[in-house]
Amino acid sequence: MPSQLDHLKTLEQRLLWLSAWTVHNANHLRDKRDDDVKVGGHQASCASMVSIMTALYFHTLRPEDRVAVKPHAAPVYHAMHYLMGNQTLEKLQNFRGYGGAQSYPSRTKDIDDVDFSTGSVGLGVAETAFASIVQDYLEAKPWAADRPLGRMVALVGDAELDEGNVYECLQEGWKHDLRNTWWIIDYNRQSLDGVVHEGLWEKVEDIFKAFGWRTVVLRHGALQREAFAEPGGETLKSWIQSCPNADYSALTYKGGAAWRARLMNDIGDQGDITALLDRRSDDELAALMNNLGGQCLQSLCDAFD
């Protein structure tokens, strides 16, 4: 019998396909005039959020919780609600068109159950913190004291952390003993406006800790952690953590044979690490190297629990 994790993986793949198709259809399949401009839609930003949103929505959330979905993950959000019967095929087909599903989740223009309107980029992040503060105010009132406290969750693109209002909000949260607030940062190191510099996550973590947040970093998935426990695993872990993002992305695209060649070239034949690699086919090696924390449903579910 399939496990809950198996069902989550099925949902993950369907969300990945449908969100990618929604953007592809808007740009390449539906009728357009010769002078129409490109529609856009951020397929990569969607792909990096699929596992996170699958674990969050289908494993973790309670009815009283509220979520601000990062703007560029709107196609994933619309795809998810389509699977649940809350969105129509016609609106997906007209994504980013007049009357279609919106570019960014919108409480006033979308028909799926949007908790927070999250355009412009960066605003949805701060909304969750102030919503939590308002929730604390209401809890102090006798007419709202029995309401269950919800978690205010922001799904944050790493490039959204360029927005100054995020840091103003962190300070306000510290002043008012912010609680029941999750900010889940999609650290995909991709930005249309610039480069997300290597090592930025450490600076971000320091800032959150300075304002009293409990930080959890999901760097490696379950497959990688299991491999690290094998002889030669620490060598592999060290290589992964020092590999530049540009190289890692290129190797992910090329696949298992490229991973094997690069690892052997960089590390050399060292017995244990060579045996670790030899125990895995090219496909298995690719799955291992792609099993980072943000793409591992098991790791995400465990962290959210």
Question: What is the predicted role of each segment?
Answer:
Residues 3, 7-15, 19, 23-31, ...:
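Cofactor-binding active-site loop characterized by glycine-rich and histidine/acidic residues
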Residues 187-305:
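Long, well-ordered, tryptophan-enriched scaffold segments
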Residues 1-3, 105-114, 148-152, 183-190, ...:
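Gly-rich Lys/Arg/Thr-decorated short loops/hinges at beta-loop-alpha junctions or inter-strand turns
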Residues 66-70, 180-188:
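Short internal beta-strands
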Residues 150, 177-181, 212:
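Short glycine-/polar-rich loops that comprise or flank the Walker A/P-loop
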